[in-house]
C-alpha cells in the first residue's frame, strides 16, 4: 500500500505478547498461552528469582501481591489474597521480561523461565494444559511437567497500517484500495484490547466489502487497466531472485532482520537504538538485493521469503 502511494498511520505502535517460545529458532515467537501463568506458572530469571515482584506499578499495588507467600495463597483463596504479579497486564509482564533480559539476567537463549512443574502434578498439567505440553514436547523437546519453559516477549499485533476512511474502509490517496483488519491503521490507538481484533475484522471487513462493491459500480465502463509494460515489469521483478548473481541466504537475512528489530525496535526504545536500527536496516536492505533463490516458483519458501524481505524491511523502517 505504501509503495502504491497510500498513507500509513500509527506504525510505531506494536503490541508484544509477554510469552512466546524463544527456542528452537524455527518456532521462535509461537505464543505460550497465558493459561500457564493462570494455572500457577511462575516467571524466574537466570538467578532463580521471581522477578515480577519488582515490577508492580503503583496503580496495581493494591491488587497484586508483593511477596511469594501471598501470591501462592491466591490460587486457593482468591477473596483474601492479592493476585500473583505474573498475572499483571500483558504490557507490564512484557516490559519486565525485557528489562531482565537487557540487564543480563535472562536465560541462555534470550528469554526467561516459565515454570509450572513445581506448582502442579504431571497429570494435572497434562489435563489443564494439553496443548502447551504437546507444543513444547514436540517442538522443543521440553517436558513442561518436569522442566521450565524458556519464554520471551514476541511481536503480536501491529496497531498501525493503511489510513482508511472509517465508513467505507477506502484508503486515502489510492483510489480503489480498501483495507480492513490488522492491515488497516487507526482503529486501536496505541494498544489493542484483547479480543477486539475479531470485532474489528467483522465490522470493517463488511464495510470494506461494501465500499469496494460501490466503488466498482461507480466506475461503470471506465475501469482502469494495467498496461503490458507494467505487467512485464512486475513479472521481471518477481523472477529477480532466480537471476541475481548474489549469494545472500534469505533465511539468514530474515533471522538477522528479526534480531535487529527485536533488540533495537522492541518494547522499550530510545533514540540511539532507533538510529542504530535504521543504519542496520539499510545494510540489510542492500544485502537483500543480492538474495538468491533456487528451484521453482511453486511451493518454494526460500523464493517467497526472498520476495517478502523487501516488504518486511519497509515495514521495519516505518516502525523505526
Predicted regions located by residue number:
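Glycine- and aromatic-enriched mobile tails/lids
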Residues: 44-64, 81-88, 92, 96-105, ...
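An anion/pyrophosphate-binding glycine-rich loop and adjacent beta-alpha core
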Residues: 7-138, 211-217
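Beta-strand segments within the central parallel beta-sheet cores of soluble alpha/beta enzyme folds
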Residues: 10-17, 149-150, 222-230
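Accessory "access/gating" subregions that flank catalytic or transport cores
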Residues: 123-175
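Acidic, metal-coordinating catalytic segment for phosphate/diphosphate chemistry
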Residues: 1
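Histidine-centered active-site/metal-ligand motif
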Residues: 15-17, 153-157, 188
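Short, charge-rich amphipathic segments
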Residues: 62-68, 126-148, 241-254, 275
Amino acid at each position: 500500500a505504501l509503495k502504491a502511494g497510500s498513507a500509513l498511520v500509527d506504525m510505531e505502535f506494536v503490541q508484544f505478547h509477554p510469552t512466546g517460545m524463544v527456542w528452537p529458532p524455527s518456532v521462535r515467537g509461537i505464543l505460550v498461552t497465558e493459561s500457564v501463568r493462570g494455572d500457577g506458572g511462575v516467571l524466574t530469571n537466570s538467578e532463580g528469582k521471581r522477578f515480577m515482584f519488582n515490577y508492580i506499578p503503583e496503580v496495581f499495588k493494591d491488587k497484586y501481591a508483593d511477596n511469594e507467600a501471598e501470591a501462592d495463597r491466591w490460587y486457593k483463596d482468591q477473596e483474601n489474597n492479592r493476585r500473583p504479579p505474573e498475572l499483571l497486564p500483558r504490557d507490564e509482564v512484557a516490559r519486565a521480561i525485557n528489562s531482565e533480559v537487557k540487564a543480563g539476567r535472562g536465560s541462555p537463549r534470550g528469554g526467561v523461565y516459565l515454570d509450572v512443574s513445581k506448582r502442579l502434578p504431571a497429570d494435572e498439567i497434562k489435563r489443564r494444559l494439553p496443548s502447551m505440553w504437546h507444543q513444547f514436547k514436540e517442538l522443543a523437546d521440553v517436558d513442561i511437567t518436569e522442566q521450565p519453559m524458556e519464554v520471551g516477549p514476541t511481536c503480536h499485533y501491529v496497531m498501525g497500517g493503511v489510513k482508511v476512511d472509517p465508513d467505507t474502509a477506502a484508503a486515502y490517496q489510492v483510489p480503489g484500495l480498501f483495507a480492513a483488519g490488522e492491515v488497516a491503521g487507526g482503529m486501536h490507538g496505541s494498544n489493542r484490547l484483547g479480543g477486539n481484533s475479531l470485532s474489528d475484522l467483522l465490522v470493517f471487513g463488511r464495510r470494506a466489502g461494501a465500499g469496494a462493491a460501490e466503488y466498482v459500480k461507480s466506475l461503470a465502463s471506465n475501469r482502469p487497466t494495467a498496461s503490458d509494460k507494467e505487467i512485464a515489469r512486475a513479472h521481471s521483478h518477481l523472477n529477480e531472485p532466480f537471476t541475481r548473481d548474489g549469494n545472500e541466504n534469505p533465511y539468514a537475512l530474515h533471522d538477522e532482520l528479526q534480531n535487529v528489530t527485536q533488540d533495537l525496535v522492541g518494547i522499550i526504545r530510545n533514540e540511539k537504538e532507533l538510529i542504530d536500527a535504521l543504519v542496520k536496516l539499510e545494510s540489510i536492505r542492500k544485502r537483500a538485493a543480492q538474495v538468491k533463490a533456487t528451484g521453482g516458483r511453486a511451493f518454494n519458501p526460500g523464493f517467497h521469503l526472498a520476495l517478502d524481505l523487501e516488504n518486511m524491511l519497509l515495514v521495519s523502517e516505518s516502525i523505526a
